[in-house]
Amino acid sequence: MSELFEKSMATLELPQVLALLADCAATLEGKERCLALRPLTDLDDVARAQEETSAAVKMLILRGSPGFSGVKPVSASLQRADMGGSLSTRELLDIASVLRCARGARDYGDSEEKTVISHLFRSLTPNRFLEDSITNSILSEEEIADSASSELASIRRHMRSTEARVRDILQRLISSNQSKYLQESIITIRSDRYVVPVKAEHKNAIPGLVHDVSSSGSTFFIEPMGVVKANNELRELMAQEKKEIERILAELSAQCAAHKEDIGEDYTLLILLDTIFARGQLSLKMEASQPGLSERYLRLRGARHPLLDKKKAVA
């Protein structure tokens, strides 16, 4: 665009109008696309864009918003997965979110009445199997479900029973006459091992391994010899758990890579729909109407600047 054109757009306050439009978009890329919009010069392009907006307005009135807030950027993640990389829980959840939004939008767009944007909804390819595989395995960014695999469930059962055994041994120590040697009657963890806080002057009264000392030097965190074997078992189980989680994430990543084309296309379509429905929402907010188009002239009847209050504007 020429400098004169940009100056004209600034004078007409187009950037402010586009900012209002961007506020109506639900996705980050949708907002960016709204801000980057410039006036169309081809009459056919203008007519198509107007029809898209009008179709979105009608659907918003009849069905409400399709909801695009769950659409997260996934292109970089899909590319890395395609190269054999293992994705993080956050990346996999974002991909599942895109698939969920694609499924919701596809259902939203199902209608006997065809519009100029119907083909966009029909082009979406939800993958419920992959979506469920991810969401059933990953409960949150920090938590993998026990049910993610039978191996993980088995490892965690053993971890819980071993941990209970360690705690039981330490609880008996805390409840015995040896408790007088403790700084506090609690069980704590140092270096992934269960320990008890022992007074410095009695550190030799409880045989075991010292894993830490308080900054004041008054407390020694000791792993009693009676729990060393069980703690070792627990450490081994934790390593097995970590390895199995890595395997699960790698497997889910490979599944995403296998469907990267469809997922990427869904993302592109959802961003496009987000911008179209942003136009529809702003149209409703401004109480705008679709104009008739002509190649020969421009006739403004009852027109007003969209930033002016309708009640105060003089048409």
Language-model-detected regions and their locations in the chain:
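Conserved amphipathic alpha-helical "coupling/scaffold" segments
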Residues: 1-151, 155, 259, 266-280, ...
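Gly/Lys-enriched N-terminal cap/neck module of very large, oligomeric protein machines
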Residues: 17, 192, 196-213, 218-222
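Active-site phosphate-binding and catalytic loops of NTP-dependent enzymes
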Residues: 82-88, 110-116, 169-185, 275-289, ...
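Extended, charged coiled-coil "arm/hinge" scaffolds of SMC/Rad50-like chromosome-maintenance ATPases
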Residues: 126-142, 229-250
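Extended, Lys/Arg-enriched charged tracts that mediate electrostatic binding to polyanionic substrates
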Residues: 153-203
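Intracellular alpha-helical coupling/juxtamembrane segments of multi-pass membrane proteins
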Residues: 155, 159-162, 241-248, 252-276
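Conserved NTPase motor "head" modules and their coupling/switch loops across ABC/AAA+ ATPases, GTPases
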Residues: 196, 261-315
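Conserved mid-sequence domains
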Residues: 220-222, 227-229, 233, 238, ...
